[in-house]
């Protein structure tokens, strides 16, 4: 009952401080994160729920993102577009970890199912849990103190009294002008209240906070009511046993074919470099090399991970260790090639917010490629480590003043004569005019 009631002001503060932060633009997000963490932790302790070992990591990442917002605002470029969803994702993951609702007991390869449970199954499956909890507590309290008959008697008494007073007021207003004027004053006050913009604004926030609070309490309360996650690792393993339809020969043939294509690609790349090395590359040719195919290389890495995941979940047998090592080695090579392209391009054309984002994407995929290669020889929780690397690196990047860093680098290159002119589009995107005015 207590936690159900506390969710009402907490949801209202989320609307005013996070979703529509006009009232608390600087500190609403970190304050809500701190209050919600305390709320979840106290509720979990009251339910005697053991937290996952990774819970502090998600708490730190979530709070760091919350604190970074009032310091630097949203980062420019795609990175800023991802901050808002990431902040909510970390919040949901913290709740799941603290309440013991992760499918594997920890983050891992079933993370998509955890996201489905955290955003859909638990909150919407328990959407009316708060209302039921409050009404049940009130009904029990009233029954214990007055009994059902007395409650009904009070309701009937109040209705009859209001009806009689209304009739009497109308008759007396017709009998005396001053009494009628008093009634008109009360009516005018009520109309002014209902037509007051501030009152309507507060009322709308209160009404909007009701479904928000129902969702939040459904997530927390629904997690604490369950003894096991909506989908467990054992259930997934049992289902996947019936889905292992890919023969080993098919998997081996497909991976060997991909390795052949990759080997041919690197042979062509090496031939191009050997042919061009004696002649040298001018700046336009170097820039063309750097920019061409960067995102395609990242897509190749994603393709490799999809192939490995498909074999892991749907293959009847794992790949031979040597073939798996070669395939994962190509992934590391693609990541290294993409890193070289990005480094050359940044050296030639300076930093932009999008290149910061590209560097982060490349870093995460490179870490995944290395973990996949290590996992061939040593059983490590590669998916868990990859998720941690993505979350921590994204948080650290959001805690850096990317806007000022981009401005400083571009101005330094211009003053040193490296760039003939400033890229005003990039500078304006990073708020250079505002910085100069200050």
Where are these regions (language model features)?
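Transmembrane-helix bundle segments that line or gate the permeation/cavity pathway
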Residues: 15-23, 27-181, 204-227
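Terminal, non-globular segments
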Residues: 83-88, 199-238, 242, 251, ...
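Membrane-interfacial entry segments at the cytosolic side of transmembrane helices
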Residues: 149-155, 317-322, 377-391
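Membrane-helix interface motif
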Residues: 170-187, 264-280, 336-344
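Short aromatic-rich membrane-water interface segments that cap or initiate transmembrane helices
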Residues: 190-207, 282-302, 351-361
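Internal/C-terminal transmembrane anchor helices
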Residues: 259, 380-403
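Membrane-embedded alpha-helical segments of integral membrane proteins
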Residues: 326-376
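Hydrophobic alpha-helical transmembrane segments in integral membrane proteins
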Residues: 395-420
């Amino acid at each position: 009952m207590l936690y159900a009631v506390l969710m009402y002001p907490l949801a209202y503060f989320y609307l005013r401080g996070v979703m529509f932060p006009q009232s608390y633009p600087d500190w609403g997000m970190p304050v809500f994160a701190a209050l919600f963490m305390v709320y979840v932790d106290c509720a979990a302790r009251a339910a005697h729920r053991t937290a996952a070992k990774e819970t502090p990591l998600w708490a730190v990442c979530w709070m760091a993102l919350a604190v970074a917002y009032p310091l630097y605002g949203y980062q420019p470029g795609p990175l800023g577009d991802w901050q808002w969803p990431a902040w909510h994702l970390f919040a949901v993951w913290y709740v799941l970890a603290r309440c013991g609702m992760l499918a594997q007991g920890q983050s891992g390869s079933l993370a998509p199912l955890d996201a489905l449970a955290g955003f859909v199954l638990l909150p919407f499956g328990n959407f009316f849990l708060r209302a039921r909890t409050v009404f049940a507590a009130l009904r029990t309290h009233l029954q214990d103190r007055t009994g059902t008959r007395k409650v009904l008697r009070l309701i009937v008494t109040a209705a009859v009294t209001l009806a009689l007073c209304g009739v009497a007021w109308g008759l007396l207003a017709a009998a005396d002008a001053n009494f009628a004027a008093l009634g008109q004053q009360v009516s005018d006050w009520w109309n002014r209240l209902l037509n007051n913009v501030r009152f309507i604004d507060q009322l709308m926030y209160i009404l909007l906070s009701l479904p928000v609070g129902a969702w939040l309490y459904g997530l927390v309360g629904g997690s604490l009511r369950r003894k096991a996650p909506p989908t467990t690792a054992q259930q997934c393993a049992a289902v996947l046993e019936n889905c292992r339809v890919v023969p080993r020969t098919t998997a081996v043939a497909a991976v060997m074919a991909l390795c052949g294509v990759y080997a041919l690609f690197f042979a062509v790349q090496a031939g191009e470099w050997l042919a061009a090395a004696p002649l040298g590359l001018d700046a336009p040719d170097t820039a063309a090399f750097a920019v061409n195919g960067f995102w395609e290389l990242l897509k190749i890495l994603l393709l490799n991970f999809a192939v490995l995941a498909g074999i892991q979940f749907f293959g009847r047998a794992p790949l031979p260790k040597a073939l798996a090592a070669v395939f994962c080695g190509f992934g590391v090579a693609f990541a290294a090639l993409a890193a070289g392209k990005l480094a050359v391009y940044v050296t030639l054309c300076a930093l932009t917010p999008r290149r910061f984002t590209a560097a982060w994407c490349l870093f995460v995929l490179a870490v995944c490629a290395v973990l996949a290669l290590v996992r061939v020889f040593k059983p490590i929780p590669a998916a868990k480590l990859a998720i941690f690397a993505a979350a921590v690196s994204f948080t650290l990047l959001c805690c850096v003043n990317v806007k000022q860093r981009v401005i400083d680098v571009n101005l330094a290159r211009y003053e040193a004569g490296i760039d003939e002119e400033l890229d005003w589009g990039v500078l304006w995107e990073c708020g250079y005019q505002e910085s100069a005015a200050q």
